[in-house]
Amino acid sequence: MSSDDAIIIRCPFDCEFAGDSISFISHLTTIHNSSVQTLAKNAYLCASEIANELNQNPNLKDQEILLLQIAQENSLKRVLRQQQKERREGKIKSLQCLFCNNEGLLNRQEWFEHSFHVHGLNIGLADNIVYINRLLEKIKNELESFRCLCCHVPCKNKKLLREHMNNKRHFRLDPKSSEYDEFYIINYASVTKSITISHSQFAINEDINETDDTISDINDEDAEPLSVECIFCTNFYEPVFCFEHCKIVHDWDIKKIQKDYSLDVYGAIRVINYSRKTKKKSIPAETDSFWKEPGWLIPVVPDDALIICLSEVIEDPRL
């Protein structure tokens, strides 16, 4: 079985259950009276680690917060290792565009750039994604069913689906759904806080205001804009303007910091959280444990709009 395949988990207790991560957590809840799902709504993200820990130490069943903390740390290590593996293998041209009819294959980075710049598909940066093959298969199945990725409106054919997604700017994943959470590494860092930064927070965030099952003329531009408090003062701005405000008024430029220190998106998230918490403009030394501690990936401000819009700012050459 490939490391990109879904994992089958066996119950660590005296029963014959074997299933996927969501079924396993449900099994622990209903059969073994576990509270892990109540404590952490995304406990399934570290389900295999929970099973491993309970196999090694069944007494952790009565210390569920500790169990979740250990499992979260190990699951984060797992997906970071997996992502490194995918990056190495991603240099090979093995990915097919989901929209083009030609048979040309792309490497990992080419696929993300092509999908975004040619088709406008915005699922975030390559650095955010793990289990890429399963993610693309899931997206492909949705498209082949002629269902919109964002609002799930059914269309009669491929042509109408493309027209709908173009008109509505729906070449992105549903920001209200958690079904893609397992493919975004940042979610593995926030399991025990019951805070889920979903795929929508690494794409252009636009509220959905649709209930009709048919194509409508409602424009997403009517959505109320996000507002966020400045990192260094109490003023509120839309995220892009907040980054500009920090650059001009507070001499804190996230794009310059990212470039000067060769940071990926996770490094930039760490810096945002660090500056929010400490109010410092300088960042820790390269050898500091700060760069390895998973806790700095967890937002200091829940649903921080600066993190939500980070990829948009990073990719925008005008900013």
Curated annotation (Swiss-Prot):
One of its GO terms (cellular component) is nucleus. A zinc finger (C2H2-type) spans 146-170. Signal peptide: none annotated. Its main location: nucleus. Keywords: Metal-binding, Nucleus, Zinc, Zinc-finger. It is found in: Nucleus. Pfam families: zf-C2H2_2 (PF12756). The keyword Zinc applies. GO terms for molecular function: zinc ion binding. The keyword Zinc applies. Belongs to the ZNF277 family. PANTHER family: ZINC FINGER PROTEIN 277. This is Zinc finger protein C19B12.07c. It comes from Schizosaccharomyces pombe (strain 972 / ATCC 24843) (Fission yeast).
